[in-house]
UniProtKB/Swiss-Prot annotation:
Xref: InterPro entries: MIC60 (IPR019133)
Protein name: MICOS complex subunit Mic60
Organism whose genome encodes this protein: Mus musculus (Mouse)
Assigned GO CC terms: MICOS complex; mitochondrial inner membrane; mitochondrial intermembrane space; mitochondrion; myelin sheath
Complex and partners: Component of the mitochondrial contact site and cristae organizing system (MICOS) complex, composed of at least MICOS10/MIC10, CHCHD3/MIC19, CHCHD6/MIC25, APOOL/MIC27, IMMT/MIC60, APOO/MIC23/MIC26 and MICOS13/MIC13. This complex was also known under the names MINOS or MitOS complex. The MICOS complex associates with mitochondrial outer membrane proteins SAMM50, MTX1 and MTX2 (together described as components of the mitochondrial outer membrane sorting assembly machinery (SAM) complex) and DNAJC11, mitochondrial inner membrane protein TMEM11 and with HSPA9.
Chief localisation class: mitochondrion
Disordered, as annotated region: 164-199
PANTHER family attached to this UniProt entry: MICOS COMPLEX SUBUNIT MIC60, MITOFILIN
Coiled coil: 199-231, 279-317, 397-442
Amino acid sequence: MLRACQLSGVTVAAQSCLCGKFVLRPLRPCRRYSTSSSSGLTAGKIAGAGLLFVGGGIGGTILYAKWDSHFRESVEKTIPYSDKLFGMVLGSAPYTVPLPKKPVQSGPLKISSVSEVMKDSKLPVAQSQKTKGDTPASAASTGAAQIISAAGDTLSVPAPAVQHEDTIKTECPNTNEGKSTSETTEEAFSSSVRERPPEEVAARLAQQEKQEQVEMESLAKSLEDALNRTSSVTLQTITAQNAAVQAVKAHSNILKTAMDNSEIAGEKKSAQWRTVEGALKERRKAVDEAADALLKAKEELEKMKTIIEDAKKREIAGATPHITAAEGRLHNMIVDLDNVVKKVQAAQSEAKVVSQYHELVVQARDDFRKELDSITPDITPGWKGMSISDLAGKLSTDDLNSLIAHAHRRIDQLNRELAQQKATEKQHIELALEKHKLEEKRTFDSAVAKALEHHRSEIQAEQDRKVEEVRDAMENEMRTQLRRQAAAHTDHLRDVLKVQEQELKYEFEQGLSEKLSEQELEFRRRSQEQMDSFTLDINTAYARLRGIEQAVQSHAVAEEEARKAHQLWLSVEALKYSMKTSSAEMPTIPLGSAVEAIRVNCSDNEFTQALTAAIPPESLTRGVYSEETLRARFYAVQKLARRVAMIDETRNSLYQYFLSYLQSLLLFPPKQLKPPAELYPEDINTFKLLSYASYCIEHGDLELAAKFVNQLKGESRRVAQDWLKEARMTLETKQIVEILTAYASAVGIGTTQVQQE
């Protein structure tokens, strides 16, 4: 199947070669053998290649003559009777009007690229083909267009029909007489820009060939690497299959030896059967390894086949020999792998027969022992395992008669079974021979088909190589001719453009001098008008500038105030952050640096200096506790104050302390109690005041909580004195910070309003 795919791919490639003009017929599947030598085939190949080359040259000349009328004229003048051939194939030559030396009111010469000429020339050619029904000519023109496109974007002369239309348009009266000469010059310049010199065309062709060479080398390297990897895996698989064959044969030989040596008894026989078991294990291991290697080899072969198919789809020039060689190596690897697999299968079949024979022998021995046990049940059981020499003097006459009688009956029975088996096996052998003949015939036909297919593929590959060589030679010749024609055409166009450039340059300079004189007078008039208007605008702008300066000065003052207000606000925010920041290692942070920053930023502001001077000195050096710290500390103070609630300022006896402590344990007042709007004398109680203060602290009102704590008396007030002092310091500092914040916000709002005004 692989060869069929390769043959079909090569046949399709051969049929589509030579731009569709020549069709290569594939070989017939049933070809008769001949007795002629290979010299006739070689001569036929040479003659066919010569015919292909001559036909390709003539066809290419006709196509290029159809494309370029000047080339047709030169060929008709050089080669005799060529005008008749061109007249039969292409028709009469189109009439070309000579280019005028000085076109009057006409546009510049338009140069068409290859793509534009193809677009313009496809329509009339297609219409003539539909009228005449000439299919080969259409295929030939398409192939010529492909070859010309491969030569690069070279300059080319338009088709005859297009030239005729252009000359007619040139002779018609020009309707665009009102266009300026500058537009004509720009069109001529843009047309000349589209021209490509021969050096650039040659460079592009060289670059394209270099790119194709790089792609072909890359493809060859990838194919070589894949083939090396596949061949390595295939070689390992073949080695594993051969090892499996050797293991199967070794096991069969050892098993045959063990079955043939039936007279051996005791430890030797046991050792012999242990050897058989070891050989069986080795056989299974080798067969499993061979199966795994075969699967891996099949995967690698499939990957290699996919790589070859991908290489065919890429259609890289010059890659056909590499692909053909890769296909040949792949086919050889597949054939070698099939042969070694067949060897393994044959060895396994032979081993299977030996195993069946062993099973039949063992079963026959068991049946024979059972028969002897049924005939002589009274004899000692140990004698049946002894040899004949040992049994000679131990059997009686009756035992011998019984054994002889049983042996005669057994011999008669075996003779009848043997005769029946011979007749049956004779029929089986005849059927097997017929089946074997059919199998041999089928195998022979398959081998012949494979050989023919391989031979056809080789012939087809040789034909493809020859066709590729001929096509490369034709393409090189065509490209050389195209380069020459493009160079001549470029020189002609360069001369024409130079003449047009001189004429247009003279007309442009004359018109330019007239326009310059007119523009000079107009410029003088407009410059005086602009000078007057400019003086008026300068005076107006100066007045506006004075107003802008005053506004900018006032704005700068407002900006400075806003900047100072912003710096004050930032410094106050830093002070607030320092008050709120605390940790377990450092519960208070000195505020001196933050306050000093405020004083420095607002050194000329008396209000700010007065507020910063009112901050307690201890806050500057040590810092203040945050509200969270005071809240946590309050709970400890609250607990101690409840314990000494009954102690007044005189500090009563130890018994009074004990009663106060007992009271704190027995009484369970609410820990938090919302304070009333007005306090009454009965509300001034240590427990209620502490509950009110706890409620205020939990709701963020530290100032009111401090007021309630300040109402405590006796020992409770003394216990809470330190906390009250810290709270008072925190509140004072916080109040000053809030005033500074409000002041900074007010100043910032004022400066913002001034800026908006």
